[in-house]
Amino acid sequence: MRGARTVETGSTSRFQGQSAPPSASVTVGRVSVTHGYDLWAATYDRDPNPLLALEERALQPLLPDVQGKQVLDVACGTGRWLARLLAAGARSGAGADFSSAMLRAGLSKAGLRGYLTGADCLALPFQFGVADLLVCCFALGHIGDLFSLAREFGRVTKPGADVFTTDLHPQGYARGWRTGFRYRSESFEIGVSAHSLREVHKAFASSGFELVRSIEPRLDEPERPIFEQAGRGNLFNRVRAIPAVLICHFRATW
């Protein structure tokens, strides 16, 4: 679902789309994952978000042909990736998320009505072995038990299925980057952690997935206008110096 979009610029100043200038002290309210995404849902798709833009730019070329395939978008939020996969020719698909507000926002999109359902990532309402392709974007940082997540993904995917995960890169997290948003002129931060590539790989390997590849893209020129439009152009060269997103491609070996 998800989209980390808060970038650290010091102990109190953060990039959050249209937040206060970096020189100003920003008061950030901390909210639970469920409450946070319910608040964010109304503006999630229209808020400029450099990490979502980077993730989409980096992940799209990695996805296989989905013509005639069955796809799942787990932690789908507003159905951002499910809509793309269905438009690319997937035979059938479904999106699951725990945020009812995010799902309502997704249902307003053309082509997604009837494809979205409320569910926990660790207890998906899908039968055994239904998916040729599964994507789970910007959600791992909200999940403590990656081994249970990988087992559940193994349950719902077919032999040889492809699984793609994306999340905030651990180096960004170490620099203070967090998941945040603006709501009614206030800044909010959602609790998140960052799993290393080794941790993610170990969890998925335990359920029979092989790591096909991992990439660690950095913010680059295509994302610069988002910073400039938000009045944060002076931050861009600093944040582009480290990997921003961790993208993993796994394949079921059974």
Where are the model-predicted features located?
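A short SAM/SAH-binding and catalytic strip from SAM-dependent methyltransferases
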Residues: 133-146
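A short glycine-rich, Lys/Arg-flanked "PGG" loop and its adjoining helix->strand segment in the class I
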Residues: 147-159
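Short alpha-helix
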Residues: 192-214
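Conserved Class I S-adenosyl-L-methionine
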Residues: 78, 212-254
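A short acidic, Gly/Pro-enriched loop at the edge of an enzyme's catalytic core
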Residues: 122-134
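Conserved class I S-adenosyl-L-methionine
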Residues: 2, 8-66, 80-84, 102-105, 162-191, ...
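Class I SAM-dependent methyltransferase SAM/SAH-binding core
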Residues: 72-74, 78-123
